[in-house]
A protein has these predicted regions:
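Charged, non-catalytic interaction/linker regions at domain boundaries
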Residues: 2-230
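Amphipathic, oligomerization/interface secondary-structure segments
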Residues: 200-325
């Protein structure tokens, strides 16, 4: 969008209104907006930030509705969740991540320099005029709604974001987690690392939101485990996930075997051998519920341990499969 003779006064008035709302006095910058401009340069001390005019007008159309909690900022048809990508809090080039998650009227994507989060940080004075930008240091998962009627509740937005984070964690070798918005001037120093692309893809990868796993306690446990920085503790939390699903896996297996036994009843007599097999099946199920067997049961049933054997820690090395199995 370019500034024209017809819209320049409206654009200047809107910028002035929004900046006043968040506590900025930038009349000089506003007065310098000229025809054919597509961006405005905002000077925050030693930090200059270029703001796309079209995006600014779209996302701050209802600036009075802006609200925020510990992790996200909402304004009109947009919600931005602050996220971290493991090892790359600073200098991240989010263009390496191509996903756009869509369903009717709703789109979720990664956004560098998230405008709404930046405005929240300015309003709350959570930036440093000399060293820390309120916008450029952040990355967000942005939910955009085509119309107000498609807006989710705050609770459902969190569930949707957790589903998207699960998908991103599964796809990349980076850990994507929600990150609490700053409650002070965040002058911590992070290591700057180069982000390597996991593919040579350059087009946006459109993914249906309907294809994502449904939100569940197990999905929440997975996200919580990925947020733990200590790898030993993270491993223990992943083990708890195996424990969580193991009763369901054990029940599934015993149902399958029980059905096989009952099918056999149709073609054979109910003799002592048959009844003993049912008793043994029950005993095997009881044994499968013991702590020492649970992890083996889940991994044997749900994972290809031939491919994973080099990644399995030594304490569970005894449960590895061989090709013959």
């Amino acid at each position: 969008m370019k500034v024209t003779e017809d819209n320049i006064d409206v654009i200047k008035e809107h910028f002035s209104k929004v900046f006043h709302y968040v506590g900025l006095e930038l009349e000089d910058e506003i007065s310098e907006i000229a025809e054919d401009d597509e961006e405005i340069c905002v000077d925050l001390g030693s930090i200059e930030t270029n703001i796309d005019i079209a995006e600014f007008l779209q996302k701050t159309e209802n600036i009075e509705s802006m609200s925020y909690d510990d992790y996200c900022v909402r304004c009109g048809r947009f919600t931005q969740f602050n996220i971290a990508i493991e090892g790359h809090f600073y200098g991240l080039d989010a263009s390496y991540f191509y996903e756009q998650f869509n369903k009717q009227g709703i789109s979720v994507s990664i956004r560098e320099e998230p405008l709404l989060i930046g405005l929240r940080n300015i309003k709350e004075d959570m930036y440093d005029m000399d060293y820390w930008s309120p916008i450029e240091e952040y990355v967000a998962l942005e939910i955009s709604y085509e119309k107000e009627q498609y807006k989710l509740s705050a609770e459902d937005e969190v569930k949707l974001v957790q589903r998207v984070l699960f998908s991103l964690n599964s796809r990349y070798s980076k850990t994507f987690t929600l990150l609490q918005l700053p409650d002070h001037n965040p002058m911590d120093v992070y290591d700057e690392e180069e982000v390597e692309s996991d593919s040579e893809q350059t087009d946006v990868d459109i993914i249906s939101i309907e294809s994502l796993p449904h939100f569940s306690p197990m999905l929440q446990m997975y996200i919580n485990a990925k947020e733990v920085k200590d790898y030993s503790l993270r491993y223990l939390m992943f083990y708890k996930i195996l424990e969580y699903i193991s009763p369901f896996v054990a029940q599934k297996l015993v149902y399958e075997k029980l059905n096989q036994k009952l099918d056999k009843l149709l073609v054979s007599e109910r003799n002592s051998e048959y009844l003993d097999s049912l008793i043994n099946l029950t005993r095997a199920y009881d044994n499968s519920m013991k702590d020492g067997v649970l992890a083996k049961l889940v991994l044997d049933e749900c994972a290809d341990l031939v491919e994973l054997q080099d990644l399995i820690p030594q304490p569970v090395g005894g449960i590895k499969k061989t090709p013959e199995n």
